């Protein structure tokens, strides 16, 4: 266990609104096709929600644009400073560049967008309200592990009906499958704290499905700061998380940004339990390295995303393409 823990160390707008019992979203389609029109008008929020939490994302239907997008919110104290949106050029859907502005947990009455450059096509901005929920860790449940290859206990897991009880976050109905020989650990690069982690998972689902255009959350599992493990694509399902080399992998994502700080003890404990289960179930030696066929690299059996990328892997994402 200790060895494993050390190892892990003109603006044109078209507005669409739909509301469900638990979630709602608004789409703004904006054109930045003139130098004098790089800042949109401000849009008053029309979606009804009992919770202030919202995620702000965007996509452009073109490959690897160099555009930088921003948004700002009008709150009770007035307009805030512009917030940059992180650009992504790797996704399951070719011909799409996506942006993520993160999650806000404050109430706001209006939103505005801007681009640093003109763009030939429209930009779709999404404001997604993941819905209200109890501000505590969701109840978890464990499916019967009978028939599994491993004798060690499977950790408790919050399945989809646990983190999305409304049923409005459907899984892929025709997934592809893979036999994993490597376990890939990620972080979401979002906030390290939240009042409602299940809502954060629903926001990731919305970003991956409705902004990225994927079939489901890209990871197989996620772990929050309270140590709750969430099933996303689930075991043996081909994910979208390892730079076009997803075959033979299981992707596990820690919710938060751990470039400068380590995950807390609860998250690490659950990660170790999940990795121990997966390694035992799939007969993977956790502290060794082996050949990974999809990347054509010999990498640690428990790796991070950085172990295989466009600069190191022969079969990584070609420059300028969109694949995870």
What name fits each language-model region?
Residues 196-211, 216, 269:
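Glycan-recognition patch characteristic of GH18 chitinases/ENGases
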Residues 103-105, 127-188, 224-236, 240, ...:
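Basic/polar, cationic surfaces and motifs that engage anionic cell-wall
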Residues 192-193:
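Cysteine-dependent hydrolase recognition
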Residues 22-63, 136:
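Solvent-exposed, flexible loop/coil segments flanking beta-strands in beta-rich domains
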Residues 38-52, 65-121:
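Beta-sandwich interaction modules
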Residues 1-25:
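Bacterial Sec-dependent N-terminal signal peptides
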Residues 56-58, 108-116, 185, 305:
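Hydrophobic/aromatic beta-strand segments within beta-rich folds
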